[in-house]
């Protein structure tokens, strides 16, 4: 785990947030507390998917999706986790899925406080980021490769004009839409909770090779 690795992940999430017009806080003074409920939902949902996954590619998908929303949370509150070097993986390791419920719960609690605490968020973001990296080592796959695949997939969540018009005609009362940060592409969100909805042209990540 290195600073350059995190910076690459951060660049990917900035690209995603720019395309989907999600908040990007350049420092803690720009932290978007109004977005914290959504961040909590995303983190909880993706970590739950990771916990229940059994097949290898689904475990990798769940862990990488958890990292994706955690890094997205970091740029939403303007705090970069501290990078901690991990020991090298053992030769011929036996893969196992490691859990980190306590760290996830701690981060969620900090995100739901009435007043956001810089030190508390920094500590818990760092712990979760470290645990995700350690979990990828324990399970025996490249987190960087997985993030590249998942990020490419996530960028296909933008809707074409034809896809958007078809959905809004069929069930427009359930969704909102707006132009994205990319020309001729649209963002569709569920009104209930603001979650981004995938278009028919969405390309799922293929993690079977990892």
Which residues are covered by each model-predicted region?
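Flexible "arm" and connector segments at domain edges
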Residues: 1-210
